[in-house]
């Protein structure tokens, strides 16, 4: 039997092409993920810098100014310092839970960004249940905090973990009910559909005006979920040293630091998507394209404008939680639980019933 060498070469070339296609397919899948991770990292660095500058302004002092221009590289300097510190592990604690806890907290929050639309269909995963995917994923983070507190074998850490779990359960329900009210107005659980539903009537079509009570409840609940003052009981310094972070150092302590700002950023992004119209400007932008001769209907220009508007709304909203940190005193644990169960839960239920009734009457 004579084997034609040209046939063998043809088969080999086809197999190489198939393998190259697979490699390119994998690279094409990784590009948006890597881009999103880099964007989130830069966003967190900007939040840290903004918080320090705003805090310095509120307290009438000078903020960071030596690490880079206007101190913008101070967060990188702090991160480098944490990387170089020794990673201590308690000898009497559960080392597995102690090591896994910070990773669970960070990864669960990172996954929430996959359903956030930064522009017109510029979203990593346009799921039909996008908003409830975020709620389900965000409820995993307190599990990591509880594991960290238990694995530290420290009474302060364990109490901090228990507080984090109790606080998350108390405020997750009002948050979910507010999201359900928004979904009823938009007839969809997709984040993209919710933004598009707000674009029909421009500025006055934002859910902020249609759901003012839900917006206030969502704001308070998201602050509690982020463990920001006045809801930072899981890491209250005067009572629990540093809560579930007490025994941590080095990169693991840095992961908790990153997780808190990741959670703050994702909550602000969801406020923008659910209540502030997302990527829609709602104001005609004729002046800038006409000056530079840019096609306003172009896809690239529209995408860039959408990203800019989403981030601008998000960072403007971030002033509220940053200013709140230096304005309000910390609540007691009983006050925190009473606020969640006795006030926010009935209000969010009433808001949901009103929304349902209005939707039924409009049919």
Swiss-Prot record:
Annotated transmembrane regions: 30-50, 98-118, 127-147, 165-185, 203-223, 248-268, 300-320, 336-356
Recorded catalytic activity of this chain's protein: a plastoquinone + NADH + (n+1) H(+)(in) = a plastoquinol + NAD(+) + n H(+)(out); a plastoquinone + NADPH + (n+1) H(+)(in) = a plastoquinol + NADP(+) + n H(+)(out)
Entry's Gene Ontology BP terms: aerobic respiration; photosynthesis, light reaction
Membrane topology: Multi-pass membrane protein
Enzyme Commission numbers on file: 7.1.1.-
Assembly and oligomerization: NDH is composed of at least 16 different subunits, 5 of which are encoded in the nucleus.
Name by which UniProt lists this protein: NAD(P)H-quinone oxidoreductase subunit 1, chloroplastic
Organism: Solanum lycopersicum
């Amino acid at each position: 039997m004579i084997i034609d060498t040209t046939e063998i070469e043809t088969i080999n070339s086809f197999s190489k092409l198939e393998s190259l296609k697979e490699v390119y397919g994998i690279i094409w899948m990784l590009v948006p993920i890597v881009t999103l991770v880099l964007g989130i990292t830069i966003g967190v660095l900007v939040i840290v810098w903004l918080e320090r500058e705003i805090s310095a302004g509120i307290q009438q002092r000078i903020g960071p100014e030596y690490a880079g221009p206007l101190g913008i590289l101070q967060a990188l300097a702090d991160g480098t310092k944490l990387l170089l510190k020794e990673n201590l592990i308690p000898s009497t604690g559960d080392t597995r839970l102690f090591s896994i806890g910070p990773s669970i907290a960070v990864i669960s929050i990172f996954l929430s960004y996959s359903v956030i639309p930064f522009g017109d269909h510029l979203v990593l995963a346009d799921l039909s249940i996008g908003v409830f995917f975020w709620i389900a994923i965000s409820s995993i983070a307190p599990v990591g905090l509880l594991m960290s507190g238990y694995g530290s074998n420290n009474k302060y850490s364990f109490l901090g973990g228990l507080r984090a779990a109790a606080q998350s359960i108390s405020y997750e329900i009002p948050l979910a009910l507010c999201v359900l009210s928004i979904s009823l107005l938009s007839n969809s659980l997709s984040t993209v559909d919710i933004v598009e539903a707000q674009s029909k009537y421009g500025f006055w079509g934002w859910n902020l005006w249609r759901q003012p009570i839900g917006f206030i409840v969502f704001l308070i609940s998201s602050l509690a979920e982020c463990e920001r003052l006045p809801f930072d009981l899981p890491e209250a310094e005067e009572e629990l040293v540093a809560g579930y972070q007490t025994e941590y150092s080095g990169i693991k302590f840095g992961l908790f630091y990153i997780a808190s700002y990741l959670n703050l950023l994702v909550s602000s992004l969801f406020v923008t998507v659910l209540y502030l119209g997302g990527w829609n400007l709602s104001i005609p932008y004729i002046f800038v394209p006409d000056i530079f001769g840019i096609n306003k209907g172009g896809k690239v220009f529209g995408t860039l404008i959408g990203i800019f508007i989403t981030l601008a709304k998000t960072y403007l909203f971030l002033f509220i939680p940053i200013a709140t940190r230096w304005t309000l005193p910390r609540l007691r644990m009983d006050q925190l639980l009473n606020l969640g169960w006795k006030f926010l839960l009935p209000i969010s239920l009433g808001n949901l019933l009103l929304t349902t009734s209005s939707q039924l009457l409009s049919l």
